[in-house]
């Protein structure tokens, strides 16, 4: 409960935030700060039981976009590898599969990519088990980030995805990137 109040107060102090604004970064720490700010601001408007842990949001953005350096992140503000199957919508085709029946979604800003990712985890049937576990952790106010990463097995075809995500989250937390200390 206290964590939720603190997150809400932090957001209120950053009231000039706008999802239409983009963030810039020159290194991993700046990238994490940008993603974190987008996530905190959006999470503040969600019921506390629906707030995706920041470690997972930042960890997946870092893993999926190579710390914001991937072609899809640079050209399409797509930090999570989100696909677009309606090819009349803005998208970028994967270079290795130009004939694919999908592209990767293009977003006006990186923050809107973060919002879409959060909404996907909160609504898509593939992540029902993730949501159920997250809710149970919310009830007792004790989150096991690494157990939650196991529930994201549908996010990638890579059978080692959860292991890679855990390593990325450990890298981020051990360096204090989420706390603003390096």
Question: What spans do the regions from the language model cover?
Answer:
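Sec-dependent signal peptide recognition
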Residues: 1-8
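Catalytic cores of secreted/periplasmic lytic hydrolases that degrade extracellular macromolecules
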Residues: 8, 16-59, 63-182
């Amino acid at each position: 409960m206290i964590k939720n109040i603190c997150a809400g107060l932090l957001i209120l102090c950053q009231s000039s935030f706008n999802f239409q604004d983009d963030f810039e970064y020159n290194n991993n720490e700046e990238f994490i700060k940008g993603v974190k700010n987008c996530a905190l601001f959006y999470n503040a408007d969600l019921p506390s039981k629906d707030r995706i842990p920041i470690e997972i949001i930042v960890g997946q953005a870092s893993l999926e976009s190579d710390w914001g350096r991937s072609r899809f992140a640079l050209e399409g503000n797509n930090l999570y590898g989100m696909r677009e199957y309606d090819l009349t919508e803005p998208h970028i085709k994967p270079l290795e599969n130009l004939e694919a029946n999908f592209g990767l979604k293009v977003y006006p800003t990186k923050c809107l990519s973060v919002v879409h990712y959060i909404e996907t985890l909160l609504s898509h049937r593939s992540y029902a088990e993730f949501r159920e576990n997250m809710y149970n952790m919310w009830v007792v106010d004790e989150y096991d980030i690494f157990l939650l990463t196991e529930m994201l097995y549908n996010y990638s075809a890579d059978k080692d995805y959860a292991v890679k995500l855990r390593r990325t989250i450990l890298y981020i937390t051990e360096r204090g990137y989420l706390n603003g200390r390096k």
